[in-house]
From Swiss-Prot:
This is Minor capsid protein P13. Keywords: Capsid protein, Late protein, Virion. The keyword Cell membrane does not apply. The keyword Translocase does not apply. Interacts with the major capsid protein. Induction: Expressed in the late phase of the viral replicative cycle. Disulfide bonds: none annotated. Coiled coil: none annotated. It comes from Paramecium bursaria Chlorella virus 1.
Length: 98
């Protein structure tokens, strides 16, 4: 065994101990932020409110259209809704449901 070998081994062990100590020294408790959980909850509330408002808007729109087009079309206008009898002022507005 060479004279320097014990010193080299001691130096390597000291470097390893120092590295382990430096990594262990910073023991701060980490708080994890989950983007999926936190943002998902907020987004679901916003999305549900938006959908509810949209459905309410469609229902109001359909109610207005029912008032504006109270007559059902017939003959060539079967499936249409009309403003007056005898197929007057008919439309095939897509969102309208009777």
């Amino acid at each position: 065994m060479h004279k320097i070998t014990p010193f080299l081994i001691a130096a390597v062990v000291a470097v390893i101990v120092l590295a382990v100590w430096l990594f262990k020294k910073d023991n701060k408790k980490e708080t994890w932020f989950s983007r999926d959980l936190n943002y998902g909850k907020a987004n679901s509330k916003i999305w549900n409110a938006t959908v509810a408002k949209g459905l309410k808007g469609i229902a109001n729109e359909n109610a207005e259209i029912r008032k504006m087009y109270p007559y059902l079309g017939y003959g060539d206008f079967t499936g249409a809704i009309c403003k007056g009898p005898n197929n007057q002022g008919c439309t095939y507005y897509a969102n309208y449901t009777r």
